[in-house]
Amino acid sequence: MAGIVVRSESAVAVMGAGAWGTALAKVLIDAGGPEAGVVLWARRPDVAERINTTRCNRAYLPGTLLPPGIRATADPADALRGASTVLLGVPAQRMRANLERWGGLVADGATLVSLAKGIELGTLMRMSQVIVSVTGVDPAQVAVLSGPNLASEIAQCQPAATVIACSDLGRAVALQRMLSSGYFRPYTNSDVVGTEIGGVCKNVIALACGMAAGVGFGENTAATIITRGLAEIIRLGMALGAQVTTLAGLAGVGDLVATCTSPHSRNRSLGERLGRGEIMQSILHGMDGSDGGDGYVVEGVTSCASVLALASSYDVEMPLTDAVHRVCHKGLSVEKAMALLLGRSTKSE
């Protein structure tokens, strides 16, 4: 994609060296990069050290050689020093705790970009709301990046697009220019609510698609789940003030299709294992690093609870989300969940 490369004079901080944070650090450099470089914060010092010495993040994005211009650190003060743009790539349920620890390290006037897709348990806040609540920044300083963005594919420079949502168009355009490359195309949007809701809910629907595949159901079932899942997402989004066009775009349908159909999707993969009869706690034990591995988060497992609670507070019906929640947290079998969904009273589409 041809375009003008706009270089930022100050460094960009990417807080979170998981697969997505690492992939976006690479995108920033490939797009022309800030003159001061990209600083990638890793929670674990050994991960930061390996990135700096090998130019690879073997723990979370194996097989990808990171370009010069990315420097990793385990010191949040080091990462945030002088950064006018901060990409927040920590898990949704840890966003608040991390922001509280980082305290006054964020520069005044900095643009804060949420990469996390979740609703906070308890408060039922979206991530942009959590960021404003903890930091006290103007909501116009907060942007959300979301779309059909599987980190492993983007790290391989496969063509992809995303949405940058912010109420401040100037900030959105600045981020768009900063991230535009020959393989990564951002679109701007002012609908922060819709962009976030699409990103959160698609993880829950992807769990359902995985469950169906694990049981042995085919493409008709998958298409039904995706389509009816989209109906749930639109109902909740509209209740919260989202625009239907956002949910019909990259941050809605696009993200939903990618996550529900890709073998690289953590949420779909976990759902598939549940459909094959594996036990939730055993699966999570192998994913969270407690078995000695590097560990990663499957947001949909938590999101199904917070999304369901949020929907209930707005009197929005979400039967698929409810079924996923029952399987993940109430011990319902996938087969019984499917039977309950199919046994619901008939209605018009």
UniProtKB/Swiss-Prot annotation:
UniProt-annotated binding residues for NADPH: 20, 43-44, 117, 151, 266, 297, 299
Enzyme Commission code(s) on record: 1.1.1.94
GO annotations of cellular component type: cytosol
Localization per record: Cytoplasm
GO biological process: carbohydrate metabolic process; glycerol-3-phosphate biosynthetic process; glycerol-3-phosphate catabolic process; glycerophospholipid metabolic process; phospholipid biosynthetic process
UniProt enzyme class: oxidoreductase
InterPro entries linked: 6-PGluconate_DH-like_C_sf, 6PGD_dom2, G3P_DH_NAD-dep, G3P_DH_NAD-dep_C, G3P_DH_NAD-dep_N, NAD(P)-bd_dom_sf
Residues reported in the UniProt entry to bind sn-glycerol 3-phosphate: 117, 147, 202, 255, 265-267
Family classification: Belongs to the NAD-dependent glycerol-3-phosphate dehydrogenase family.
Protein name (record): Glycerol-3-phosphate dehydrogenase [NAD(P)+]
